[in-house]
């Protein structure tokens, strides 16, 4: 625990922003530099089977300290930060004993305000780590990495705490949906695992969205504007017409809880060709299928009305709801709940309105729910973390390892 904050502050100085436009893995060189740093740290801690592969996947093991067989469990976090905001030259600031009110972020005009982020009201007395208002912080997911390694350090320094084999995995490119692409589950060696990639204290998640993307391509007819009457088909107009027919009350900014959505994420516009990039999210498989069918029906309807030009849609599934793969192993959830309760943390079981590496890993044979980090407002300049909640995450990780060993004693 003594090195938790120092670790985190050091980790966020690495620029590990992933790049969805790059097809290589990892998608950015900074992730590999960070992985090499972590590899040395794992070796310095004395862990075994420390391996960093050419794709930036880093794995290691803390061997069991008990004489009887205990299932190997794992803890996983990702090394990249989101492309949504800069992760370069992160300058974290520590706010000691927060007593309310606005927090100035750096020397500019940006503030972290409880008016905009009311969760701050519950954090009076906490020590907070914030940005300087120019970058994201990187608590997603470097807080998770720092917490895992601090928990491992605690287990090493306290051999009286029983534990089985503890497998550690740090992945690249999670933020661009590729974190599990080349993850070797067999090499990892755990029977089940936990991603340490959640938000506020108490979060325990084993449900997530089913996720698909839809690239909607509009083919127009380009003609000189001066002679375009009855000839031009403006693909940008088609794109506008299509989007105007999408449900306005089923977007990220209008939904919560178990509600799904359509999200227009990108647009490339031109007269001859335009493209809209959507992501589709729903907690039910039938729901995601209905969303695809609805969008396809819009395209089909437009195509029947067009004499020239056309609309096509390409759907790609990204990940599925891990619930169906985790629920058959209730002990995985119960151990995490029990660990939280012993550590005086109230479990908050709720769906992830997103995805984690664990969602895909669960479908690869590794049940893998998600546990809190103590971070807030991920992917933007108002991201921050509570040091006290980060410390609780460390305690919960240690307690999961201990309770697992005691369960099989």
From Swiss-Prot:
Chain residues that bind Zn(2+) 1: 78, 140, 197
Keyword Cytoplasm: yes
Sites where the protein binds Zn(2+) 2: 140, 175, 379
Family annotation (HAMAP family): Aminopeptidase_M20 (MF_00550)
Gene that specifies this protein: pepT
Annotated active site: 80, 174
Top EC class, one word: hydrolase
Gene Ontology, cellular component aspect: cytosol
Subcellular location: Cytoplasm
Cofactor or coenzyme needed: Zn(2+)
Gene Ontology BP terms: peptide catabolic process; proteolysis
InterPro entries associated with the record: ArgE/DapE_CS, Bact_exopeptidase_dim_dom, Peptidase_M20, Peptidase_M20_dimer, Peptidase_M20B
Annotated function: Cleaves the N-terminal amino acid of tripeptides.
Keyword Hydrolase: yes
GO molecular function: metallopeptidase activity; tripeptide aminopeptidase activity; zinc ion binding
Organism: Vibrio vulnificus (strain YJ016)
Pfam families: M20_dimer, Peptidase_M20
UniProt protein name: Peptidase T
Stated family: Belongs to the peptidase M20B family.
Known EC number: 3.4.11.4
């Amino acid at each position: 625990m003594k090195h938790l904050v120092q670790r985190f502050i050091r980790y966020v100085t690495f620029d590990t922003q992933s790049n969805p436009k790059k097809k290589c893995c990892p998608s950015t060189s900074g992730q590999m530099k960070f992985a090499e740093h972590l590899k040395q740290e794992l070796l310095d801690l004395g862990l075994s089977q420390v391996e960093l592969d050419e794709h930036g996947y880093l794995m290691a093991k803390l061997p069991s300290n008990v004489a009887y067989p205990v299932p190997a469990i794992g803890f996983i976090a990702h090394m990249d930060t989101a492309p949504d905001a800069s992760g370069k030259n992160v300058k974290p600031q520590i706010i000691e004993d927060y007593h309310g009110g606005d927090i100035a972020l750096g020397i500019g005009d940006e503030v972290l305000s409880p008016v905009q982020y009311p969760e701050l009201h519950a954090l009076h007395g906490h020590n907070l780590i914030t940005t300087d208002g120019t970058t994201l912080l990187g608590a997603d997911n470097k807080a998770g990495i720092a917490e895992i390694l601090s928990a491992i350090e605690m287990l090493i320094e306290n051999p009286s705490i029983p534990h089985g084999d503890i497998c550690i995995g740090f992945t690249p490119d999670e933020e661009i949906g590729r974190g599990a692409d080349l993850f070797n589950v067999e090499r990892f060696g755990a029977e089940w695992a936990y991603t340490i990639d959640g938000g506020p204290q108490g979060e325990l998640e084993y449900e997530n969205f089913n996720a698909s993307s839809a690239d909607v391509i509009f083919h127009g007819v380009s003609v000189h504007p001066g002679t375009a009457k009855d000839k031009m088909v403006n693909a940008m107009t088609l794109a506008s017409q299509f989007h105007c027919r999408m449900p306005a009350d089923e977007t990220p900014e209008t939904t919560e809880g178990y509600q799904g959505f359509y999200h227009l994420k990108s647009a490339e516009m031109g007269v001859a060709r335009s493209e809209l990039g959507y992501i589709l999210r729903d907690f039910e498989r039938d729901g995601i299928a209905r969303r695809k069918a609805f969008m396809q029906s819009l395209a089909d309807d437009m195509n029947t009305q067009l004499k020239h030009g056309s609309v096509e849609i390409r759907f790609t599934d990204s990940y599925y709801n891990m619930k169906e793969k985790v629920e058959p192993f209730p002990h995985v959830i119960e151990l995490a709940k029990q660990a939280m309760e012993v550590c005086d943390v109230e479990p908050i079981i709720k769906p992830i309105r997103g995805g984690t590496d664990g969602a895909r890993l669960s479908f690869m044979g590794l049940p893998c729910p998600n546990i809190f980090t103590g971070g807030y407002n991920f992917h933007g300049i108002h991201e921050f973390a509570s040091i006290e909640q980060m410390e609780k995450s460390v305690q919960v990780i240690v307690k999961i390892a201990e309770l697992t060993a005691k369960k099989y004693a």
